[in-house]
Amino acid sequence: MAGSGVRQATSTASTFVKPIFSRDMNEAKRRVRELYRAWYREVPNTVHQFQLDITVKMGRDKVREMFMKNAHVTDPRVVDLLVIKGKIELEETIKVWKQRTHVMRFFHETEAPRPKDFLSKFYVGHDP
């Protein structure tokens, strides 16, 4: 008896999950744009403060690349989670809680996707 009530309550709760911050996708997109603008404005300060061996343009291009990596996400809760993580990274960078090496990890060469078929794995040297 009690088991069916619990099952019904969990099934009802799982269908109506409240988003973290954004009520809909438009609000989530607005939060992403705000975060992008904050990172875009912070790049010149970061390059100067950490004395990075990159230009401001390269830094801004990397910021764009990092944001475009998650452009396919459509769930507002996941977008909110990514925005929260981005804000934490931004705060750590602004307050110099990171060291130069932590910041430069973002600027390693973009990794090529791993091969998926047998011949590509064989040519690269990965195990099948």
From Swiss-Prot:
Membrane topology, as annotated: Peripheral membrane protein
Highest taxon in the source lineage: Eukaryota
GO molecular function list: NADH dehydrogenase (ubiquinone) activity
Subcellular location: Mitochondrion inner membrane
GO cellular component: mitochondrial inner membrane; mitochondrial membrane; mitochondrion; respiratory chain complex I
One GO-annotated biological process of the protein: mitochondrial electron transport, NADH to ubiquinone
Family note: Belongs to the complex I LYR family.
Subunit structure: Mammalian complex I is composed of 45 different subunits.
PANTHER family documented for this protein: NADH DEHYDROGENASE [UBIQUINONE] 1 ALPHA SUBCOMPLEX SUBUNIT 6 (PTHR12964:SF0), NADH-UBIQUINONE OXIDOREDUCTASE B14 SUBUNIT (PTHR12964)
Protein name: NADH dehydrogenase [ubiquinone] 1 alpha subcomplex subunit 6
